[in-house]
């Protein structure tokens, strides 16, 4: 008996069903490195329009976490998609290498008493070691880039470039020295940037403190009263008793009503609206004697509770009635608004009291509290206030308070002499940096759009930028200050260039070991060489000035403006922010055309990842157990504009999506294995109707996906690929196509037409998925191109052949698909009843009206192939009510080869188990098909 199975064109491919990703992926990475794929892509893309995604440098400290993986995978998807879209899209990874965390690591390992030059040497070595660790982990994620030549902020050329960027800002007039309150961490021993501050709950003492009036007659006049007969106190409320030794003024709102309250032994000055709450807090009875506006109390002097000095009233619009007394105590060294108020009222910088030292202790010469830690001094200060009779109430409150992001310890505002970039100082063209930056925000595209208003608000409300730090491991601020006047050397910009040249050769150590006389000659005796270093946000914030201008081999030759910066949403106050300020200061515009922000990773319940919750997922573990491809697909399938949920269950669902795509790809490869596009292609006009429809819906997918890539909406692409593989192909086109692919003659026009369509579909699918499923696309591409050292990334998105009348074709086939879906439901009901197994055991009768009838009639004899039944009869229904689809089990004979049930099985006596169609396909001229 003949084995007709061997006569079928059964699919065959070297592309395995199982991805076995954890084992196979390292091999692809090794192949890319061996082939120098990144360099090949650069060569292939030379001369195309440029697209530059400038890498925001991760900090060179510790292994990668999921946030790192998310960020780098998103960048890789964008760079790959831009390459496939026809751009020259280089990707130069970078690392942020200076700063306190690395210095802290070195101190922990080697102790705090090392010489400064040794600290810098160890920091540089540690950062280099961390870069190598992170680099390997990024490469394992399938990220393509110039990994052999990354940019590091500690590269000598970049350190020199940073000094030159600072020189540009000095030359423009933005940089000044000033005494201002800055975020200060006692553990860091340094000022902190806004981006290094986080908020957490803190329990603080809350005290109500009376300041005795030093000018009772003026106070009486303000309230329209005769001279007062007993003491009067203005009462303040504060949660920072430690600032009271530095008090130098009181603030009242000019428009608020203030009351003079008689409590028996003395008068209290309180905001009128808060009198009741205050008296209850103090356990006192009292009556309001008189009221006046805050403006009437301007400059009235009160006495410090325990020091012999005055605290005048300064008016301030920032005073509120939300809590407290309506009177604010002002310690200008330890509060931004306090500082601004006192300076606006004529207080000179030299007059501002700064008793708190950098380590958190009071200066030794401070009366009563000298040498004490400020936090430990709070109860001592409260006791002193009680002793002098000025403590009216005390309590404990829990409130949100600023903390150091590294040490998790409370911060203070502390006025120190620092270097600043001025936000509101007009420069040569009359504009301020704030104005330039706000215009820059408005000119930038944001993904998602809400990022614009967020960054705009931050720029509008931010203070001057404190760019100096008091640390060892950082790029120096190479200034010489006159020892008597404190002024910068008149040749500062010129001297900075000389320093930059030395740093270019020797690194930052060139400045720290420099003898001033080498540059200043005889003038050196008059000048002091400062030791401050630059804020690390200035490091990364100026990479557009040196990395993109060509300090790196892949410099963006068109200039320092990148097409895109992409980071987490916290970088609105970090890298996006500092880059915007430096770009606008130096070039007058942002260093980027667009900003893309992504959210943070959370677990399935929306909780942050933490070891204590046990919900941490490491990218290394996912790569080892499931494959980096699954992590890439998870990133792409999630809407990154908000929080990104991840868990074992979520990743398992991603695996199912991957399997669907892989199985579809395997079918396509298996059924085009014997097809050569150069020899076997069938012209489009000779394709069957359903093949032209498949071309049309593939074109729709390609157009939509390419548009979504351009908009960075990758989750829409993954959704579309799922629908395409599962519904358009798997449940429709490929399902119908199997009969033609397997049963017609191998070289028949009907089969070759199908294979031509499948070849175009495969090319399209592979290139659309390549930015996301990079390993799998490469694996499939190798199967398509055996023996060639080729890569899908050396090509561009597939150009599908054009065809006329596509809209009408699609509309007709959408109707056919809708009818087919209803027919399959009817057959499924028959299967559920146990009357048929496969759909080929059924016969259909379709009674349809108008458009449906016309669409199905257009299929002619091929109708049964579309419905996947052995027979399909079409009748025209008189009305919608008369429409029906009826399925019945076939009573005919099953063909051994094609499994259709027909009356002509055995028609050919030599092949008694074959239907006439199969006999003709095997031994005759072969069947003719026109539609399916």
UniProtKB/Swiss-Prot annotation:
* Chain positions recorded as ATP binding sites: 611
The coenzyme or cofactor needed here is: Zn(2+)
A molecular function annotated in GO for this UniProt entry is: tRNA binding
Could you say which enzyme class this protein belongs to? ligase
Q: Where does L-isoleucyl-5'-AMP bind?
A: 567
What is the name listed in the Swiss-Prot or TrEMBL entry for this protein? Isoleucine--tRNA ligase
Its gene is ileS
Q: For the motif 'KMSKS' region, give the residue ranges.
A: 608-612
Q: What lineage does UniProt assign to this protein's organism? A: Bacteria, Pseudomonadati, Pseudomonadota, Betaproteobacteria, Rhodocyclales
Give the InterPro entries listed for this entry. Answer: aa-tRNA-synth_I_CS, aa-tRNA-synth_Ia, Anticodon_Ile_BEm, Ile-tRNA-ligase, Ile-tRNA-ligase_type1, Ile-tRNA_ligase, M/V/L/I-tRNA-synth_anticd-bd, Rossmann-like_a/b/a_fold
This protein's domain notes: IleRS has two distinct active sites: one for aminoacylation and one for editing. The misactivated valine is translocated from the active site to the editing site, which sterically excludes the correctly activated isoleucine. The single editing site contains two valyl binding pockets, one specific for each substrate (Val-AMP or Val-tRNA(Ile)).
Q: Report the principal subcellular site.
A: cytoplasm
